[in-house]
Amino acid sequence: MDEVRQFLPPFIADEAVFDGWTPTARDAAAAAQGVEAGLATPAFDKGPMDMIDAWIGHIDAQMIEAFPPERIAAMKIRERIRALVAFRFEAVAHQREALRRATAIMALPANLARTARISWRTADLMWRLAGDTATDYNHYTKRMILSGVYGSTLMAFLDDESPDFADTHAFLERRIDNVMQF
């Protein structure tokens, strides 16, 4: 079951472009990848948020793999955060419509608590990869601020039609500049 939850999400995202985050998308992805429906259905039995959460978890895993300590060690903290946030957008650039549909589902009132947990998990992971070891109030404020930066930049990314997402990168840079003014 865990293997299916780790393997299938990017393929569900590919199908979500056409079918939304639905059982139809899940089943089409499973069929295309040779995964039995009897395994795919219970792996995502709590509906769209299960599929979306697993997809975001997959992106988290890609980010961990892409940023080993030796790659990130030479960067300044600001550069680390910028690179980590930018990576997440690059990882889903070909699935922006799936991301757009996912954000709509995540914004539903019934999903806000889980969305907040997912956002926190992602911000925490980025800070940990960046080398943050804070355990005092800074631990919490850094993650809350990064969640806001990431979320607002995500909205800019969804509407960005500039070459190589230059507008998104510029937006991210401005948000980081805003945070540095605190």
Model-derived segments and spans:
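Amphipathic alpha-helical packing segments from all-alpha helical-bundle domains
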Residues: 110-132, 141-147, 151
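Amphipathic alpha-helical segments used for helix-helix packing
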Residues: 91-113, 117
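Hydrophobic alpha-helical connector segments
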Residues: 66-101
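Short, basic alpha-helical nucleic acid-contact segments in DNA-binding proteins
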Residues: 58-65
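Short, amphipathic alpha-helix enriched in basic
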Residues: 1-38, 46-53, 57
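Residue-level detector of well-ordered alpha-helical segments, enriched
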Residues: 8, 25, 51, 55, ...
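Hydrophobic/aromatic-rich alpha-helical bundle segments in the mid-to-C-terminal region
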Residues: 132-182
